[in-house]
Amino acid sequence: MTSKTSADLPATAPAVAGTSAFVLVYHRSPFDEKIDADGTRHWVDQKSPNGIIPTLRNLFRSQRSGTWVAWRRQDEEGPSDDELVQMDPPNDFMLRRLPLTTKQISSFYHVTSKESFWPILHSFPSHFSVDNSDWCIFEEVNASFARA
């Protein structure tokens, strides 16, 4: 698997925004990233408790090309470029990882998504909770996914 930032790819690469025939947007990556002591990166199957990751990965089997858009946690001072990773066959798709800070992940995912939307979408309106102070971060993160 090759890791690059979007600036490293030629304009005709399939992972350039708006050019993939099939795009899947999901908050988690299709594989967990493991980095050895020598800096070598490996991708391993996720231990998804509900099986959604393997199911979503299977969607790419019938596609000639595609891009999976997910986030990656970044340090506050770290590089903020999107990362593009060409996954090896049989997972022949691009992984586009959007950099999100710990604060963005907490606000977007743990607060707004899990406490506000999930209870309603899963028919538990009594568990609905909202904190409008997180809404601007939710919009910011969604805009990043939309641009990808």
Residue ranges and their predicted role:
Residues T102-A148:
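Conserved nucleotide-sugar donor-binding subdomain of glycosyltransferases
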